[in-house]
Amino acid sequence: MPRVKRGVTARARHKKVISAAKGFRGRRNNVYRIAKQAVMRAGQYAYRDRRNKKRVFRALWIARINAGAREHGLTYSKFMNGLKKASIELDRKVLSDMAIHDKVAFAAIVNQVKANVA
């Protein structure tokens, strides 16, 4: 079995980790052993927070819709129930955007909802 010198592959592996740790502070960005741990942890945080982001944004949309609905005298739950009864199929992302940027259209939807809630 011939001897294998691992200089090329080891250097490539180290380079990959060090480049992934670019922007980290202290020895985390230039010492391989520490950078490897930092990159691993960063990956764990990224994995976790890709899932958390969905929850956080949904909560933000709900808060915005609630604020918009309360301006027109409805609570969030009554507003969403009215949307279902009026068979208006807009998702929370679109509704929250309308509540912030297109108040006229949101008011029109609220009026339709009020007709179905009462």
From Swiss-Prot:
Gene3D superfamilies in the record: 6.10.160.10, Ribosomal protein L20
Report the GO terms under cellular component. Answer: ribonucleoprotein complex; ribosome
Task: Name any Gene Ontology BP term.
Answer: ribosomal large subunit assembly
Which molecular-function annotations from GO does this UniProt entry contain? rRNA binding; structural constituent of ribosome
**UniProt KW keywords:** Ribonucleoprotein, Ribosomal protein, RNA-binding, rRNA-binding
Q: Which InterPro entries match?
A: Ribosomal_bL20 (IPR005813), RIBOSOMAL_L20_CS (IPR049946), Ribosomal_protein_bL20_C (IPR035566)
Function summary: Binds directly to 23S ribosomal RNA and is necessary for the in vitro assembly process of the 50S ribosomal subunit. It is not involved in the protein synthesizing functions of that subunit.
Per the similarity annotation, which family is this? Belongs to the bacterial ribosomal protein bL20 family.
Tell me the protein's name: Large ribosomal subunit protein bL20
What are the top taxonomic ranks of the organism?
Bacteria, Pseudomonadati, Pseudomonadota, Betaproteobacteria, Burkholderiales
Designated gene of the protein: rplT
